[in-house]
């Protein structure tokens, strides 16, 4: 599909949601027959929980729901305030206004955001998860992270990526394999944010705010459908596990995530969540495949998240000149190494990957902190 401009968003209706809104669809439709044309959907600005679909507010235990998710705020992180949370459903986009709706509105969304029965399609969930956790006590769970999925697909199809090669959302949208639309307005919004960090706090929301917020989730369900056609069973397992680790990444606490949902693990016959004892959305599709492999002695390589505390004044050594030191560790170990950067935390390094790779990275990074 050739790259095209985004649809004319002026055709979309933008209005409050009636309190009895009941048009929530439980199943995500397949990709449009003509993928060069995306159907327009209404955009609803939500300031009260009663304006959200009941099946979202109270996720049914016997059904699986797939939604698109993104968050906007002031330099969004643990301290950067969440202003808008966007939800893309099959037939509508909901802009959940955290400012006018206050904490009560976001707390009303907590069961859905933590539910294993609602799959949240999101691009790079780490900072969104951090903001939700530290500002609202929400433990984001059951995500389909399109950034992770893209890397797994590239690896499976034989296109090797460098350790720092993370696909941006704009680049993912432009990729004709998944969406094939340009997102020129994203740069305009970034320019406005650089000039005015309070951009997302203004009320009522301007047309460009509404359009930009909606565009960040509009195509996620379509991308999800495309990616599911490319992900093999082994990749789905790694996607489920790594997505859970991404959600935890910046959400550091003192109890080693004891109060978080359990990570997916391999039992004797089934993949289960230790606490819920139910199959997850991704693992259901690979169950039969992996049961056969288990019988043959196969065990998926467990991945972990390790948090390395860096002593004061040592982060420069860890990173190295122009990132050379940390880049060499990534290339040597194959683990994913993440630093907080300007948003922090400034004294920690986060390492995600198979256990052996993570332990090797830990040793090398500790060596760089030593005084000689």
Task: Describe these PLM feature segments.
Residues 1-67, 235, 248, 271-286:
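N-terminal accessory regions of nucleic-acid-interacting proteins
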Residues 17-19, 94-97, 309:
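Short acidic/polar alpha-helix capping motifs at helix-coil junctions
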Residues 32-37, 87-88, 296:
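Short, conserved catalytic or adaptor-binding loops enriched in Gly and charged residues
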Residues 36-39, 113-115, 302, 343-345:
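Short glycine-enriched loop/turn motifs at secondary-structure junctions
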Residues 39-230:
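Conserved DEDDh/DEDDy metal-dependent 3′-5′ exonuclease domain
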Residues 143, 230-238, 340, 344:
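Short, flexible/disordered secondary-structure transition segments
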Residues 190-193, 197-299:
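Mixed-charge, glycine-rich, non-catalytic linkers/tails in nucleic-acid processing enzymes
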Residues 249-372:
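Predominantly single-stranded RNA-binding modules in RNA-associated proteins
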């Amino acid at each position: 599909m050739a790259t095209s401009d985004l649809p004319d968003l002026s055709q979309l209706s933008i209005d409050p949601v009636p309190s009895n809104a009941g048009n929530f669809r439980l199943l995500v439709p397949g990709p449009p027959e003509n993928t060069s044309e995306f159907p327009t959907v209404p955009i609803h600005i939500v300031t009260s929980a009663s304006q959200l679909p009941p099946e979202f507010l109270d996720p049914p235990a016997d059904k699986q729901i797939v939604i698109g998710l993104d968050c906007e705020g002031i330099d969004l992180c643990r301290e950067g305030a969440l202003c808008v949370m966007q939800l893309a459903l099959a037939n509508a986009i909901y802009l959940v206004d955290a400012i006018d709706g206050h904490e009560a509105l976001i707390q009303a969304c907590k069961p859905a955001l933590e539910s294993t029965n609602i799959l949240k399609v999101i691009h790079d969930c780490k900072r969104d998860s951090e903001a939700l956790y530290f500002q609202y006590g929400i433990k984001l769970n059951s995500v389909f992270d399109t950034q992770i999925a893209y890397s797994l697909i590239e690896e499976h199809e034989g296109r090797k990526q460098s350790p720092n090669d993370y696909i941006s959302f704009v680049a993912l949208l432009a990729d004709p394999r998944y969406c094939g639309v340009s997102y020129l307005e994203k740069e305009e919004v970034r320019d406005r944010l650089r000039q005015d960090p309070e951009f997302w706090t203004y009320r009522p929301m301007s047309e460009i705010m509404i359009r930009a917020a909606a565009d960040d989730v509009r195509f996620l369900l379509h991308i999800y459908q495309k990616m599911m056609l490319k992900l093999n069973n082994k990749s789905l397992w790694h996607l489920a596990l790594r997505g859970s680790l991404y959600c935890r990444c910046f959400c550091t606490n003192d109890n080693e995530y004891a109060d978080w949902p359990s990570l997916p693990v391999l039992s004797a016959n089934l993949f289960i969540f230790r606490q819920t004892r139910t199959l997850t959305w991704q693992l259901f599709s690979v169950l039969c495949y992996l049961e056969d492999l288990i019988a043959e002695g196969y065990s998926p390589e467990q991945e972990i998240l390790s948090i390395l505390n860096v002593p004061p004044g040592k982060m420069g050594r860890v990173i190295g000149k122009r990132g050379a030191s940390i880049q060499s560790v990534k290339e040597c170990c194959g683990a994913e190494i993440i630093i907080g950067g300007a948003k922090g935390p400034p004294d920690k390094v986060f390492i995600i990957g198979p256990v052996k790779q993570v332990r090797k990275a830990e040793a090398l990074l500790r060596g760089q902190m030593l005084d000689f």
